[in-house]
Amino acid sequence: MSDAVQTGWQLSEQAPLRTLNTFHVEATARWLLNVQAPEALPQALAAPEIAGQPLLVLGSGSNVLLAGDPPGCVLCFDNRETSIIAHRADHAIVRAGAGVNWHALVLYALQQGLSGLENLALIPGTVGACPIQNIGAYGAQVGDFIHVVEAFDRHSQQFVRLDAADCAFGYRDSVFKQQPERYLIVAVEFNLPLLHELRLDYAGIREELASMGAELAGAADVAQAVINIRRRKLPDPDVLGNAGSFFKNPLLPSEQIAALQASFADMPVYPGEHAGQGKLSAAWLIEQCGWKGKREGDAGVSPDHALVLVNYGTATGAQLLDFARRIAESVRERYSVILEPEPRIIGAHW
């Protein structure tokens, strides 16, 4: 592997990616670009080895499945600065570089007396990746707290600032996911309140707080409750390869929901993102089809959470993808519901 080192960036050839994705599957980048100084990005992208080539941005690789070697160049941001850039009477603006660990940012905000992100504690990944998927958990979505996304626009070759409306946030969606080849996120600014109405009505948070003896809960207590729940339900990707929840919870029109409930009375249904729709539990659908805890070779579904696809050791990305496709097909056959993957599939089509 040859290396080219420049001010603020480094280019490596034939770089292994196993440690750069949380499924821990083997893949190789023809070129790997590490950027420490975002202002050097235009110069780095103009390097003759990678100019004009396809570009894949990897944070910690916690929301991708490498089903093959990515074409072109893999880009990793290594800017890890976090600071409060503005104080207001009831909130503050926190700026974090794309390379900052997401959970570290949540803890930083809590240490500064700021709330809003506590339900998103312990989600693997980096700050730069969080707007792409509009990460969410336990009743919260990061898009509700994003003030500005700073990005390099590959179309205009300019650095731009996109406010929350420009980002077009939706359920596990954003303009960055819709146009993956256009924007390279270099930093995110968050609008975080000093006092925030806590979200306690999701997935056993109240029960966990009670077991902690935290009847008068604050944001830090909620974060600890979420951490406890996640550690019990979700495998540590450092120990067992996974990307968290592999499938989105399906959003369906109310009429389709009613028809399903007429046939499957015990099917849980949750409020949708908009009027006239409901949300199904993908985990429930998968478990009902018999996949929870199932294993074939080193590809499997966690015995603790039916949404979590796991690599027990040497499964390839292609094997994991085939396993996931068969899960989705069995759900479609039984319930006429189409499951969509949360992670971005690289090197193959879903």
Curated annotation (Swiss-Prot):
Required co-factor(s) are: FAD
Main localization (coarse): cytoplasm
Where does the record say this protein resides? Answer: Cytoplasm
Pathway it acts in? Cell wall biogenesis; peptidoglycan biosynthesis
- Swiss-Prot/TrEMBL catalytic activity: UDP-N-acetyl-alpha-D-muramate + NADP(+) = UDP-N-acetyl-3-O-(1-carboxyvinyl)-alpha-D-glucosamine + NADPH + H(+)
- Domain FAD-binding PCMH-type: from-to ranges: 24-195
InterPro entries (alphabetical)? FAD-bd_PCMH (IPR016166), FAD-bd_PCMH-like_sf (IPR036318), FAD-bd_PCMH_sub1 (IPR016167), FAD-bd_PCMH_sub2 (IPR016169), MurB (IPR003170), MurB_C (IPR011601), MurB_C_sf (IPR036635), Oxid_FAD_bind_N (IPR006094)
- Biological role stated in the UniProt entry: Cell wall formation.
In its UniProt entry, what is this protein called?
A: UDP-N-acetylenolpyruvoylglucosamine reductase
Recall the taxonomic lineage recorded for the source organism: Bacteria, Pseudomonadati, Pseudomonadota, Gammaproteobacteria, Lysobacterales
Gene name of this polypeptide:
murB
